[in-house]
């Protein structure tokens, strides 16, 4: 599941299968992502050349020194795509994405230096990302906060789990809850 291997296979007609196998490997190594990552690329619904082009595109974004390939860069790329999808979806896209400026304002008002951060409708997890960023920016200890959340839409919950995993944030207490009640 190494990026270098995926990049080297990007032009192969079996790239979809390679991506699915990589997703399985990532889930094995990261139990919090179990049954979260999509494994649909080998089905043939996406043309292998398009998958390869997407791998090349993402690889070009992450080129540079080790710092440029940090979780923060991947997180920003992920957030950018979420924003673009939300714009394309219109009102429906607001279900999983709250603009960064709104989340930043909420976090600044809450000042989550320590304790629990609970988001009952966590969407893609932006509140958790900004809370940890707030703590780090104010020379606090990220381990002094614990995040808890729920999401009723399973696809959106998966987006949150991926978003947090990319940034190295523990998502074990972010649950899928389609019951319509607080956990």
Model-derived segments and their meaning:
Residues 92-183:
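Conserved S-adenosyl-L-methionine
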Residues 1-113, 174-182:
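Non-catalytic, mostly N-terminal accessory regions of nucleic-acid modification and defense proteins
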